[in-house]
Amino acid sequence: TVNTSYFTNELAMKPDFQMQYGNGFNQNFGWFFSNWGPSFDEGGPAGWGRQNAINGTVSGQPGFLKHPYNSNLNARFLARDLLPLIGLSMDSLWEWKPYDSVGDLFQPGEIVNTNINFRGQSDDGKVSYNVNYGNLDDKGFTPGNTLRRNALSFGGRAVLSNKITVNGTLNYTATDFKTPPIAAAYSSGSSDSSLYGNVFYTPRSVGIAQLPYAHPITGASIYYRSSNGIQHPLWTVNNTGDAQMTHRLFGGVSAQYDISDNLNLRYSYGYDVYSEDNTSYQNKGGVDGSLETQSG
């Protein structure tokens, strides 16, 4: 027999983010990690129409900024002649609007579970066997979060002619689990990496999915923050992680001798062998995390 099941999973809920204000402080624009900048409306006391960086005075197009990667501060970590290598130029602009960075990052995951079973017995019913193979492929809504498991099991029973009954089972599982760092974090870089910690405070005017995350030459993290002070969440996904590989072999055998209908002798032997390899890593090129951005 073959059985297959398919499920999806998704982020249960996310904060009720405001979608009215973007980067900055005191209704003034700046490439910070705050949401106290100008409004996404052009008019009014806090409107972007009062901001030279957004109203077209600097960018040449109202409602647009110069792209964060071609700003003067960011030229120190991303030379301007390298911009074409990531699809940008000195004329690239950034639209002043609310972005759904959390929704863009956490996409629905999927779970596929497949089981194949063979079983049979002899004509007289004294010998029977069972073989089962299972495969689980679980991709979470967090990018880079996966669990894959293969399981194989054998079982059998034989009633011998000399009043002895033998039973045996053999089970093997291999589990491969991978995830980016997702625990609570208190800084913005490599010393305390956390995908969740570096995503949920993202300003509304920053789109994570729309910003390249890796330096075209060194592979280091690049991001919108002035002087590159925050590690790009997508760089975290692709360059950091925790991995666990588990192998387990277990089962047992038993033999029973029937002395009479009401009396028997039984011998059982069981075994369970387990190994686990754990790896935590981060590639070279992360941000030093000098900005404290408490999350969690």
What are these regions (language model features)?
Residues 1-3, 111-115, 128, 132-139:
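A beta-strand signature from Gram-negative outer-membrane beta-barrel systems
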Residues 124-129, 163-166, 262-265:
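Repeated loop/turn-to-beta-strand initiation elements of outer-membrane beta-barrel proteins
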Residues 104-109, 120-122:
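Outer-membrane beta-barrel initiation region
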Residues 111, 123-125, 159-161, 258-260:
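Outer-membrane beta-barrel channels and translocator barrels
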Residues 116-120, 154-158, 251-257:
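Residues on the lipid-exposed face of transmembrane beta-strands in outer-membrane beta-barrel proteins
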Residues 3-95, 140-145, 151, 155-248, ...:
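Surface-exposed loop/interface segments of Gram-negative outer-membrane beta-barrel transport/assembly proteins
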Residues 125, 132, 155-157:
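Outer membrane beta-barrel translocator domains of Type V secretion systems
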